[in-house]
Amino acid sequence: MQKKQTLNYVIVKTDEISFPFGYSEVLILEQDSIELLETTKFKFKNEDRLVIVYAEDVYTEEVKFLQRGLYIKPLDAKEVMYQGEKALILTFKALHFFDIQNFSYEMNQDEIMSANFLVDGNAKGTVGYEMVLSGHINNVEDVKENLMNEFRQDQNKMNFFSIFETLVNNSNSFGISTNNQAGTAMLFKQNYGAKDEVKPYDIEEIKALIDSKITQDNDPSEFLLNNFESLMTYFGFLDLNKFPHKWHLYNSFDYGNFTRLINEVGNFIQTALKLEENITSEISKKLNNQQKEFMLREKRKVIDDELAKLGKDTLQDDKDEYVKKLKNKTLKKMYPDSIKEIIRDETKRYSEMMQASPEANLVKNYVEYLKKLPWRKVSKDRLDIKYAREVLEKYHYGIKEVKERILEHLGVLINAQTYNKNYKNEVVSIDENYEIDLNLFKDKPSEKTVFNNVPILALVGPPGTGKTTLAKAISEALNKKYVKISLGGVKDESEIRGHRRTYVGAMPGKIVKGVAKAGVSNAVFLLDEIDKMASDHKGDPASAMLEVLDPEQNAQFQDHYLEQEYDLSKIIFIATANYFQNIPEALIDRVEVIELDPYTLNEKVQIAQKHLIPKVINEVYLDEKLFNIPEETLRFIINRYTREAGVRGLKRILDKIARKIVIKRVLEPDLKSFDISLNNLEELLGVAPYKTDEDKHDEIPGIATGLAYSTHGGSDLEIEVNVFKSEKGGIQLTGSLKDVMKESAQIALTYVRSNAKYFGIHSFDFDKHTIHIHVPEGATPKDGPSAGVTFTTAIISALTRLPVPNNYAMTGEITLQGKVLPIGGLKEKSFAAYWKKIKYVFIPHANIDNLQKIPDEIKREITYIPVKRYDEIFQILFRDQKPENTITFN
């Protein structure tokens, strides 16, 4: 039977869906719905009815409604505050589904929200304009009776209630929500206040409230009906987030197949209960194991304490390598007593901790690292000066000063073993390769009886001059382990000293890591690119290196991770740098600085023939006959295809030639030999990029050749000057010049202007002309005062229109009074003049002593003209006077 009615409706969010015949409550946020319920003054008659329409979002202008709503009997409505806004909590009993699609017309927002006059007022209050909804409602009592008959015939439903009761009792684990929305948590609350805030109920309170409402609303004797309504109420409490199947139950709810619905929920509950049982069992087992572990550890602690009183130590595992070493009379001397005590204490501390504790893992890692370090273990030196000299000569040509220093150190070691009476008492042999040096890790420096005078070197020179490979050769010559530590870009002090163990992911610094990697405390350490360390807010790593490189301090090096001193006094540290000026002064004061010269042409030829060519042949698996290169061709390659201080570029050129020959051999299997000559060189390498005879500039006014020095070695510097009229006059500088070089140009101009008559500049108006000074290769930054005399010469040449001979170059700082001050990098600048085939070089008189460090091969090709004042240069270049003093080498 169907009855047409005019009904009020309220809009509720879709995540608060409920089921027919159950009790529930919802939070009403939509303002029109609130105004509707306020007209009832929250007092409902028994025959009052409403419709709940579900919407995805009640705040948007175009509300999208679900096709299925609920026909309800309102029980109570109270005002609450929700997120600072007024809201209503509506308590109701759901009577039936309300299918919007069965209405006599299609439901849409415009029609529903339009005002319809309430003719059948089914709620108390003033008759007026309210939201209404028209449709057909099935006879609720008939549907309920049919469902109850189905329940009476199926006794299995009673078993379902016991299952569902278990689910309710475990609501925290399975999908029953006690605060699904703020309103749901306030289910059946009796005392509301206008300012009440929403509070969640626990599941026992909800069960009690549901039972009380069912008892009030139904005949208590109807036990089956009570259970049925309680079941449908529980359905409404299923949390959509934990039980997404609730949405399917709501949409597919079919009165004709209610048994299927119950079975689906029952299956879910049984699966959830089984899963919960398994999880609970695993947790219980884990907790039992932890409790068992705790009890055993406590017992072990008491036993260990008692054994300790008897002088017995049971904290160590016999399978531990460290324990085996302690039982060995020789190996136990490897560890200082203080370290053994720390390991023992930390091991005991670890044994008393729960292994699941985060701190336990930190303590374990710390102890393992202490055991891993070599401490007093060192490798035996090969005390053979002849062998060491052969190895050093094998890998490097030249570099006499470094080789001599290493041989001196080897001589000291031999002398110590021969004449020091205490030496044998301080060293315990392990095997033919390793020994224990008891002179390490002395508690007091005064206790030391053997001093090895271990060198700490700093090799400074251009790239490609063999600094890095030299350290490898030294380690092989002395039979020591080799460790490379790259310092380029390091800007955090903790990378050197390590991190404190309080930090997450703490680890030792690069130095201690290197010692652990080497496995001995007397390795050769290469500190590569020490001049490229940086500093920031995290500290200055160069300051940390002071302790490493100071022979007076490195016996007590402090690493933050170890929190113990480590003796680095037996380690040979070899630092490398490209530019002397970039090394902190404090570090320079602590090391022996050995400058490596750029290689001369003859040295490059020797290096190529003895080292590079054999290496290239081996790398590409060629026969020597297929890589036949005469010395003439090799010299041509060095002069015309490379321009460098070292030999890295030469190595790449030779690699390229070798690959070309390999291709020829693959294409011509019968090829037995191949000669690399000047005739086929262009075919193999292309056009030569450098043409030394044609590199000199044309002799035109305004150009002078200077000499410069950078991290890559020496280079020539052609300075150009041009003059043009302007209103303000002055000087214009281009070519990426830095401050010192700009000041040098300003000084040169001031000096020329103040001595204009002496230089033959009579009619030039400095105030109406701009002097533009340019230094080519503008992309390369340039700095330094040594171009002062070159600036002066170029300015005078431009203003007098007298050219400077292109076989002259110069270097020197100039003052406002014309004095020529000393400069640095004379050796590198001489190399640049040599490559440029410049015959005469002006140098400051104070730099004469530096000529001794320049290789004879270079000096023989250059005539040096030392000067004290600039006018000496002027007289030679512009007045054709012969120099009073020249220095030549035959």
From Swiss-Prot:
PROSITE patterns linked: LON_PROTEOLYTIC
Pfam assignment, any one: AAA
InterPro entries assigned to the protein according to its UniProt record, in alphabetical order: AAA+_ATPase, ATPase_AAA_core, Lon_bac/euk-typ, Lon_lid, Lon_proteolytic, Lon_Prtase, P-loop_NTPase, Ribosomal_Su5_D2-typ_SF
Annotated Lon proteolytic domain residues: 698-880
GO cellular component assignments: cytoplasm
Positions of the catalytic residues: 786, 829
Taxonomic superkingdom: Bacteria
SUPFAM superfamilies xref list: P-loop containing nucleoside triphosphate hydrolases (SSF52540), Ribosomal protein S5 domain 2-like (SSF54211)
Subcellular location field: Cytoplasm
Amino-acid positions noted as binding ATP in the UniProt annotation, renumbered to this chain: 461-468
EC number: 3.4.21.53
Gene Ontology BP term (one): protein catabolic process
Record's subunit section: Homohexamer. Organized in a ring with a central cavity.
Protein name in UniProt: Lon protease
Source organism per UniProt: Mycoplasmopsis synoviae (strain 53)
